[in-house]
UniProtKB/Swiss-Prot annotation:
InterPro entries: Pantoate_hydroxy_MeTrfase, Pyrv/PenolPyrv_kinase-like_dom, Pyrv_kinase-like_dom_sf
Protein name: 3-methyl-2-oxobutanoate hydroxymethyltransferase
EC number: 2.1.2.11
Organism (species): Paraburkholderia phymatum (strain DSM 17167 / CIP 108236 / LMG 21445 / STM815)
Binding site for 3-methyl-2-oxobutanoate: 53-54, 92, 120
Amino acid sequence: MTYLQETSRSAVTVPKLMAMREAGEKIAMLTCYDASFAALLDRAGVDSLLIGDSLGNVLQGQSTTLPVTLDEIAYHTACVARAKPSALIVSDMPFGTYGTPADAYANAVKLMQSGAQMIKLEGGEWLADTVRFLVERSVPVCAHVGLTPQSVHAFGGFKVQGKTESGAAQLLRDSRAMQDAGAQLLVMEAMPTQLAAEVTKQLRIPTIGIGAGVDCSGQVLVLHDMLGIFPGKRPRFVKDFMQGQPSILAAVEAYVRAVKDGTFPGPEHTF
């Protein structure tokens, strides 16, 4: 099928993301779970494809990401990788797969052998030794702080994080700890815009926001959300880019443009 052919643009690598941050070019990331969408998103200019454990929600109908398994992430990673996208492929480490550094490494190896070029895990200071262990063994790491969906029961629901002075201070410590341990990318979810801006200012590595304001180095959304495919109430940080567009490709291109020119997210999408 022609839509699975390689694109002509140069590969987006981990060093390329750092160069984009230093040049002030915004990074556009979307979740992706299969080869067809990987090819389409790559054609639209998306910089990074995240095989997120959000597949538990949007593909499997789960109420949380907790039931998603390593084998499932590996399967969808391989599907995305077969499209040979120029975009950087990042794969989530599911709940329970990185409790120890050794477990994290063994499971990260499986994802990278499936086609991941970077792995993402959720946590803060407590995760520093694991991140360091992975990076020392040539596993690029994207850390995820703020609202970490795998901690939904500990949080008592999907709630904005860092709203209190102590909570904000902890998120700053978590973010610095992840960078100091060697993480090369940081996702920040559902936190006050001012806090996310301060984290971005303090760190050297790129920050990717989802409900974290426009001052991050880039943005990520769940693909289904930005296409308007969400049951029930639309999350505050989501914009339906499919509205007014003639095709999915055009909608994704509109998302990329909005991220790059800083018009998304707007104040109505932030906390």
